[in-house]
């Protein structure tokens, strides 16, 4: 059964009608694995405040839980204690909970009507994993989908290891202060300021969207959402959060973790070259590869204008649609890679980058931790 996500989340959402605009994104990674305080990403997002309208903001940080590096850090929002009790029963049946607590926040006049926000550091119970015949990651994905589709008023919004997603209805900088991000240290940060155009502003619909260690922030509109959603359902993913970006997080998990595609190849699935360009490609091997990808993964092609920044355990990437209908800028400084909607957001925290460029349409910008980190 899939619970209809509507009335039970009414107090977490704000509908203002459709207003064309563009979200704001920023991502930072230290390829040497140096951890940075959360106020850095907050300041970058503050610079592009006007790209959002206060109906959603959020962040993901990697490396923030070194004391629980081998545990899944499960962040959950609950509408009420009844949903919390039902969810915790499912968690205790499936997981060994090492530690649980309310996610630390601080009072803010800018963030209102917050749900109950809890985090659980846990490991799958070996007997349950064996009985299910699944790997730990697959077991966790199935558990997340079960909770999100069957427990009323409950949503798992982060489920990776040594990382966490923090999001709410509000401007990004206010969300960051609400969740006390300056107290966290991460080697990768991604941030998002939302301006919803087709879907409601509510807590679960804020970005980033996450599954396991994949976290996605997105500016644009995924017109292929229906096809992508039906394709993902064949592999056990359920889209319940009223926002098209959700499919992007699940597609990265499916293509790279489940199907084992290299990151660069997965990007060529999502932002595939046009047939007219494949037909005239003079590199026969490349032509064969792109033809095969489009035939095998046609339903994973993401159509529409988009710019995304994706965080994962050992890296970060930025990717545009194949026509570049949304802005995306990249820069480097020493071991740092920056990706953002605007150069100004990068220069706010890195006034003199070594290099600044606009990535080509459909060409990923990838920063990964060095091998010994």
Where in this protein do the model-derived segments appear?
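Conserved short alpha-helical segments that host acidic/polar catalytic motifs at enzyme active sites
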Residues: 1-373
């Amino acid at each position: 059964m899939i619970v209809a996500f509507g009335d039970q989340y009414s107090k977490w959402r704000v509908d203002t009608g459709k207003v064309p605009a563009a979200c704001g994104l920023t991502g930072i990674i230290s390829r040497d694995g140096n951890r940075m305080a959360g106020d850095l990403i907050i300041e970058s997002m503050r610079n592009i405040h006007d790209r959002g309208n206060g109906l959603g903001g959020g962040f993901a940080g990697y490396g923030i839980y070194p004391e629980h590096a081998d545990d899944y850090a499960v962040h959950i929002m609950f509408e009420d204690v009844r949903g919390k009790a039902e969810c915790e029963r499912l968690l205790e049946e499936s997981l060994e909970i090492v530690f649980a607590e309310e996610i630390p926040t601080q009072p803010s006049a800018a963030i209102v009507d917050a749900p109950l926000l809890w985090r659980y550091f846990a490991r799958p119970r070996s007997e349950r994993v064996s009985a299910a015949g699944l790997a730990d990651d697959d077991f966790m994905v199935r558990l997340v989908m079960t909770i999100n589709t069957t427990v009323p008023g409950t949503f798992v919004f982060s489920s990776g290891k040594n990382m966490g997603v923090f999001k709410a209805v509000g401007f990004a900088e206010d969300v960051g202060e609400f969740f006390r991000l300056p107290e966290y240290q991460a080697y990768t940060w991604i941030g998002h300021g939302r301006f919803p155009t087709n879907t409601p502003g509510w807590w679960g619909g804020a970005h980033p969207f996450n599954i396991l260690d994949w976290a996605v922030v997105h500016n644009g509109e995924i017109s292929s959402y229906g096809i992508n959603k039906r394709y993902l359902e064949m592999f056990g993913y359920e889209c319940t959060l009223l926002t098209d970006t959700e499919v992007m997080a699940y597609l990265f998990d499916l293509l790279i973790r489940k199907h084992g595609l290299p990151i660069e190849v997965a990007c060529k699935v999502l932002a595939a070259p046009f047939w007219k360009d494949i037909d005239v490609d003079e590199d026969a091997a490349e032509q064969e590869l792109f033809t095969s990808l489009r035939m095998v993964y046609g339903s994973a092609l993401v159509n529409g204008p988009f710019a995304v920044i994706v965080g994962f355990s050992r890296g970060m990437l930025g990717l545009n649609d194949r026509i570049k209908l949304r802005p995306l800028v990249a820069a480097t400084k020493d071991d740092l890679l920056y990706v953002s909607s605007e150069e100004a957001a990068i220069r706010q925290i890195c006034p003199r980058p070594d290099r600044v460029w606009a990535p080509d349409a459909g060409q990923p910008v990838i920063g990964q931790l060095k091998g010994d980190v």
